[in-house]
Amino acid sequence: HFGSSVASYFIFLRWMYGINMILFGLTFGLVMVPEALMGKPYGSLPRKTVPRAEEATAMNFATLWDFSGFAQYSVLFYGYYNNQRTIGWLKFRMPLSYFLVGVGTIGYSFMIVIRTMARNANEDGGGDDTSFNFSWKMFTSWDYLIGNPETADNKFASITTSFKEAIVEEQESRKEENIHLTRFLRVLANFLALCTLAGSGYLIFFVVRRSQKFALEGLENYGWWERNEVNMVMSLLGMFCPTLFDVISSLENYHPRIALRWQLGRIFALFLGNLYTFIIALMDEINLKASVLFLFTIFNRHMCKDEDFQQLEEEKIVKYNMTIWEASLYNGTIPENSTAPPIQVDPADVPRGPCWETMVGQEFVRLTVSDTMTTYITILIGDFLRAVFVRFFNYCWCWDLEYGFPSYSEFDISGNVLGLIFNQGMIWMGSFYAPCLPAINVFRLHTSMYLQCWAVMCCNVPQERVFKASRSNNFYMAMLLFILFLSTLPAVYTIVSIPPSFDCGPFSGKTRMFEVISETLEHDFPSWFGKVFGYASNPGLILPFILLMVLSIYYLNATSKSYKEANLELKKKLQSVRSR
């Protein structure tokens, strides 16, 4: 009913659902379940216990909806996991498993996306034979084995839509246009699109600066909108800017398939700017959380000298002040060069440093949930209620609502595709800090499939100019691969460069997260294996190997192009022989 272009979106969504099922299986089976079954239970450690000051509101709906309270101190987030090398009677290596699953999900995603692109390119390599196109459709489209009336109606609609697509292709190939007017309108459209992108970027920058000011003054002093302003503004921009780009693209007079790619590119730039502005804001918030460590030094600061105080690192300051705090519980005093005796304290009463990894995971989960809710509300209001209004008020209105304003809505291919791609980018980027993200995304994709199918069939009308989509979804896959690469960079940066929080997460106590690999090689493998691994990871071997891979890719690409050219030549010869 709606053509191959709309069908390509749902095929892409189904493919994404399969990928996320694998990611969910890895994180759920190798990270969340082992920690829940074999790890220390809730309340045994400070990192697994809600602080005393938050216990009263830990089960409130508003707190849980914000993924704080008991949700924050659970297997859903990074900070809950303990740093023991082995847990349970199976001696399950939780830190190693957490690290390998985080790296493995990214590696698997790269492998499956590139493999799918290669398979699609291979299937599409023969090109499209347009000889006697309408004759082939007329005499070979019907399936004479159909015996069900509903199936026959669907097949009839499919054949009709394929004829419409072929007519559009034929019209576009014969179209004549005023080249000077077309160039002027396309330059104007690009200028308006750039102004829209710049305005959205400035708006996000302004909102991020406001959120940092709110964080410094204390978010508890502000309302719901101020606490969620960044997420809501990003969701609203993602909802309204694609519509504005769609209006701008009507000036350009491109082929519908090319217009869709321009639309995708503009929305891609919009979402990319939004995503990286959000990441920069998170990095600033991480630095802000790190500076909070110094607040621990206010208590009993007079107990250490100024020169000693300046020499202490941030984490040592927190640990030192915890020792002072434990001694002060019993009105005891300790010298500066000694440690406090072990004191039995309830984990809920122990002060703890900020866990920036959990904070990052919470932000990604909130953004994913708010984006999902915005999408569903948009479908409900923009599609369903609009269709109900047009359907029942058309009889008593001053003009024809079906063919005038507002009319029935069309399915927004570009906005939905880009929303799907960037949501997946957030899943890849945030799943290392929130193992629950793949599960949330599986639920989102599952409900979106049925909700959007229902909205398309019941509330939307086919596009005014139905066009034939490419037989391969490689344009979607290329954007997905680019987003995967960009989503990998922040995660790799935090793993390699930023020290993990010292009192939460499976890597606490280590200088860098990747040290879990060297620790495993040292304790669980013979010494010769560690030496071999060290030699294999030497840059002197890695760089030539990468160079060899690049040269191999260049050679295979050149060979593929030559095969395609030979294939086209053979097709031309076959056509010339057939015409004789």
Regions found by a protein language model. Give the residues of each.
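Transmembrane transport/permeation module of multi-pass membrane proteins
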Residues: H1-R580
